[in-house]
Amino acid sequence: MHRKRLRVVLSATLLDLITCVQLMLDPLVRSHVIARLVRWRHHRLLLAELVLSETRVRILRLALEQGALESGAMSSRALARIVIPRSSSRPNWKLSRVVSELSDNSKTNVYKNQLFIHCARYLLHVLP
């Protein structure tokens, strides 16, 4: 993929980005776009405001399919913003435990990533 085209894709809106990622056939390019998406501060703030919706599920599913979680391309903190809504009035106790585990500095990054992978798979399983 040419740099110019990649730049256009990366400068698209969040929903356009998700659509572009879904349409891309090259898994390396898709992983790269997902990794860039979750690292951008602006888009991470957008992700933090998402509710448990089709959009959130699509982001998680894409990340899981592309191995972005296992490879560490998506940080634990970025994934936490997707999995755990800020405005949740009654957070699931399992998700609350994930938050406390994330803030525990004695836990390794590998452990935290595995915890979030499990959490993401759980959400994808229980949500329609």
Curated annotation (Swiss-Prot):
Keyword Secreted: yes
Annotated TM spans: none
Compartment list: Secreted; Host nucleus; Host cytoplasm
GO-annotated cellular components: extracellular region; host cell cytoplasm; host cell nucleus
Coiled coil (UniProt feature): none
Disulphide connectivity of cysteines: none
Keywords of this entry: Host cytoplasm, Host nucleus, Secreted, Signal, Virulence
Superkingdom of the source species: Eukaryota
Comment field on protein domains: Has the canonical translocation RxLR motif, but lacks the canonical EER motif, which characterizes most oomycete effectors identified so far.
Role played: Secreted effector that completely suppresses the host cell death induced by cell death-inducing proteins.
Protein name in the entry: Secreted RxLR effector protein 57
